[in-house]
Amino acid sequence: MKKEYSYFVIYHGFILGFVLIAITTFFYIQNSTYLLPGFNLFSTIYLVLLVFFSFFSLRIFVKQHIQHNYNFRTFFSICFLIMLVGTFLSKMYLSLLYNFDNNLMLEYVDYTYSMQKKINPTYSIQDWENTVSVHFTFFKQIQSYVFTLIPCTLYSAIISLLIKLIR
């Protein structure tokens, strides 16, 4: 990728990451239960922002480089890398929150234990807490981040196709 594209990607990826961190912090301060897994206002805003920010960043790129004729691959790379940088920053921030705020971790354990108890009633909360704490190690968070990139690939392909069709 050309240097001018990489600067654009890193710049917009950092902006996306900091906006996602700001939204996470806002919901964390308002009510930390929004950060728990599931479909809620936080997850909806997070996904909508992720998609629309990438779309509008790509539109800015196209307007800045109007004289060039770019292909789908270039659009896809730019869009995906913006999401990659933004979600990485956001994921690392969430990891810090869960590892340094014991109350948030306990809320997570209680929330997921209530679902786990339906599946396996003999599982104690201490066993479940140990299981969950293993999932919040740095390596497991990186692994979780990699799986987060799968939907980002799909979003990038759709956004790139839309930009290519609009152009």
Feature roles, as predicted:
Residues M1-S57, F61:
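Transmembrane alpha-helical insertion/packing segments
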Residues H12-I21, L47-V51, C79-T87, K91, ...:
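Alpha-helical transmembrane spans of integral membrane proteins, capturing the lipid-embedded, hydrophobic core
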Residues I23, F27-N31, L58-K63, S90-Y98, ...:
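Membrane-water interface at transmembrane helix exits
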Residues Q30-I45, E129-V146:
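Membrane-embedded or membrane-proximal helical elements that form or frame transporter/channel pores
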Residues F56-F75:
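Membrane-helix interface/capping segments
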Residues K91-N120:
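Functional transmembrane-helix hotspots
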Residues M115-T137:
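Short membrane-interface loop/juxtamembrane segments of multi-pass integral membrane proteins
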Residues T137-R167:
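Transmembrane alpha-helical segments in integral membrane proteins
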